[in-house]
Structures are given as structure tokens and as C-alpha cells.
């Protein structure tokens, strides 16, 4: 069995996340695909996730991909959180997400005053209403009332500002975000927005998702996969990896069991430690994927500086694949203030590299840099 140290894992995973060197300009969709989508609860963070990995990223590239080229799609996905997914891969994600039991638990819907039967009726009406249309929540509620004849169901949709009631439609491939009008969010149906090819079977889709997760976030455990996916629990994760058979292999990471793609075993074993400094934004995919074993990539007792209350994940100063500090940025007129707070004294070379990244960020955001180091 292959035995790895966390130093090797950090280097290997950084390479898989394109954090050792940036991808060429124009690689935005390839990076989004490799990361299994971009976490987009905060859209600006999704943009900076790409900035940290793609050379010469255009500041407006994500907006154009979403609303003009329609090559990225914003929808609810893993863990019920907002993601940007490559449009060409939506059939895969919808097929896998449709197996999730996350929103099939009656207790969730009792809080909304809905039964599962009423939820299914509402979800079906949403799918019909959005076919070929782009609607605000209010317009969607009105159309749902027309289709169902139920003012009560329409009211449930209109009165809730939360996305929970819309997520079953998103998981089954019947809803995604359309372009907003001012501050008003709008929704549409993926098959009419981007065109949907035939979905793979649920079994094939879940196996592919598990394989792609390990390719980007491995070596990983059943628990890592279960947390990242957000449904099905440990039993579901075990079932998914078992489906891969010989495509995955057991490894030990500093004595702890994990799994890796079999084709990656030799590459990971022989991979050299990297020299790389990056400013990762809030909710970066690298940090999200490490949430269960972050203590191996962080100094002792500093987990709560990165993984904060209410699910907030701080921007991270990443050094050679390890989390060595946090940072933030603020716009102040025509200046960008970047505040770097390393967890300990950093070597001069790391300091220079971090300053270069901050300068690169200021250029990307079209501001002059004001850099502040704090203990």
C-alpha cells in the first residue's frame, strides 16, 4: 500500500487545483470542471477562485460566461449550496443530484407547511412554468398559481426569500438562475437556457462524480466525500467508491487510511514538494475540500480562524499547499487595501511572493495597491 505524508498530499492536491502554476488564459471552463464546480454563495469569491488559477483572467469573463455565452450555469448543487457549473456538464450533475435524499425529508417541509406530495406538485409546476421563460420569484409564483389553481402553493413560493423551496427543482434539472433585472433575481429552466443533452444513468453519474472528486481532492476518505457531497452520509460515500472497483486504490496518509485514483498512485508518490504562494478567496474549493482534515494543513489550534461560525470560510494565504494565514481586501476609492495576517513569521521569499500576488490582485481589480501586514 502506498504511504504518503501530508507534505506530499498538499503538493499533489495543489497541482490538481492548479495552484502550483496558473493555467493559460482562456482556461476558465477547464478549471471550473477540474474543481467540480465553483462555490458561488458569494459570486465575487467564485471569480477570485478562478483568478488564483488562471493567467490573465478578464474581470468580466465570469459574467459573460453566465449571461451571454451561457457556458457557465449558476444553480444549487453540492451541499445544497450555490455553484457555477460548466453548462456542458449539467446532465452529469443533474443525474447525480437527482439521487440525493437531502430534500426528501418530511421534517424539512413541515417548517414550510408543505407535505412531500405538495412539494412534488409545486416542483412540477415550477418546471412547467420556467420552460422557455426567465422569471422573477413573484412572476414564477403567479404562474404556479395559474398552473395548479392553488393560491396556497403559490404563496409558499412567494413568501419565502430562501432558496430551500426551489432546490428540489434545481436538483432535478428543472431550475437554474437566469440574468437578474436590477436587484431582482430571475430563474429559468436549464434545458431551454443552455440546451440539455441526454442525462447519463444515475449509477453512471454518481460513479463519475466520485471519480472526479477523488481526482481533484484525493487522497480522501469516505467522510471527506460525504461532507463534500452533502447527502447520503458515509454509507452513500462508501457505496459510490465501491462502484469504482479497481479504479481506486487504498493509501495511507501519515498512517490514516484514504483512497486515491489508481492511475494517480505513482504520480502522487513521485511528486515533488512545490513552491507556491497564493491568496485564496473566501469559500475557495481547496479550503472547502480540506474541511475534515484541515488540522494537517494548518498550524495547531487555528482551525477557527479559517473555518468560522455559520459556515463562513475565510480567505487564506496558501504557502506550498498549507494554510499559513488569512487575508482580506477592501475597496477604498481608487485603491485596494489588502490586509495579510500570517499565523506566524513568514520567510522573506514567501513575503515577496505574497506581495506579488497582492499586486496581481490589485491589477485584476483595476486598483492601486495598499498592502498591510498584520500579526
Which residues are covered by each model-predicted region?
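Positively charged, polyanion-binding regions of nucleic-acid-associated proteins
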Residues: 115-134, 202-220, 239-240
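Active-site-proximal binding-pocket segments
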Residues: 207-264
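A short acidic, leucine-rich amphipathic alpha-helix
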Residues: 65, 137-145, 169, 222-227, ...
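Short, cationic-aromatic polyanion-contact patches
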Residues: 84-90, 181-200, 257-270
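Non-catalytic regulatory appendages
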Residues: 243, 247-302
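Phosphate-backbone binding and catalysis cores of DNA-processing enzymes
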Residues: 1-152, 300, 337
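A short, conserved structural fragment
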Residues: 67-77, 81-82, 171-180, 245-253, ...
Amino acid at each position: 500500500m502506498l504511504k504518503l505524508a501530508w507534505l506530499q498530499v498538499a503538493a499533489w492536491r495543489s497541482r490538481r487545483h492548479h495552484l502550483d502554476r496558473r493555467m493559460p488564459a482562456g482556461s476558465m471552463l477547464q478549471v471550473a470542471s477540474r474543481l467540480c464546480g465553483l462555490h458561488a454563495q458569494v459570486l465575487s469569491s467564485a471569480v477570485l477562485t478562478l483568478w488564483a488559477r488562471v493567467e490573465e483572467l478578464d474581470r468580466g469573463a465570469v459574467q459573460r460566461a453566465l449571461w451571454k455565452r451561457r457556458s457557465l450555469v449558476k444553480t444549487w448543487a453540492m451541499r445544497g449550496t450555490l455553484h457555477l457549473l460548466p453548462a456542458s456538464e449539467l446532465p452529469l450533475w443533474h443525474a447525480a443530484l437527482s439521487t440525493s435524499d437531502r430534500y426528501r425529508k418530511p421534517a424539512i417541509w413541515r417548517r414550510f407547511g408543505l407535505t412531500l406530495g405538495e412539494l412534488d406538485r409545486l416542483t412540477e409546476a415550477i418546471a412547467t412554468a420556467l420552460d422557455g421563460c426567465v422569471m422573477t420569484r413573484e412572476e414564477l409564483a403567479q404562474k404556479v398559481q395559474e398552473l395548479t389553481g392553488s393560491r396556497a402553493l403559490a404563496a409558499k413560493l412567494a413568501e419565502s426569500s430562501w432558496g430551500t423551496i426551489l432546490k428540489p427543482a434545481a436538483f432535478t434539472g428543472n431550475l437554474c438562475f437566469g440574468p437578474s433585472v436590477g436587484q431582482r433575481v430571475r430563474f429559468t429552466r436549464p434545458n431551454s437556457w443552455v440546451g440539455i443533452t441526454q442525462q447519463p444513468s444515475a449509477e453512471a453519474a454518481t460513479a463519475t462524480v466520485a471519480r472526479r472528486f477523488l481526482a481533484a481532492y484525493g487522497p480522501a476518505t469516505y467522510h471527506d466525500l460525504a461532507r463534500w457531497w452533502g447527502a447520503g452520509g458515509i454509507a452513500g460515500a462508501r457505496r459510490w467508491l465501491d462502484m469504482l472497483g479497481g479504479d481506486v486504490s487504498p493509501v495511507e496518509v501519515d498512517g490514516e487510511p484514504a483512497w486515491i485514483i489508481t492511475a494517480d498512485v505513482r504520480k502522487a508518490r513521485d511528486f515533488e514538494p512545490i513552491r507556491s504562494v497564493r491568496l485564496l478567496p473566501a469559500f475557495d474549493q481547496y479550503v472547502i475540500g480540506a474541511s475534515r482534515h484541515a488540522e494537517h494543513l494548518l498550524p495547531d489550534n487555528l482551525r477557527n480562524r479559517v473555518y468560522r461560525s455559520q459556515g463562513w470560510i475565510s480567505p487564506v494565504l496558501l504557502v506550498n499547499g498549507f494554510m499559513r494565514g488569512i487575508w482580506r481586501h477592501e475597496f477604498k476609492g481608487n485603491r485596494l487595501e489588502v490586509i495579510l495576517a500570517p499565523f506566524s513569521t513568514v520567510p522573506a521569499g514567501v513575503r515577496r511572493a505574497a506581495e506579488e500576488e497582492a499586486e496581481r490582485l490589485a491589477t485584476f481589480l483595476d486598483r492601486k495597491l495598499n498592502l498591510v501586514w498584520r500579526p
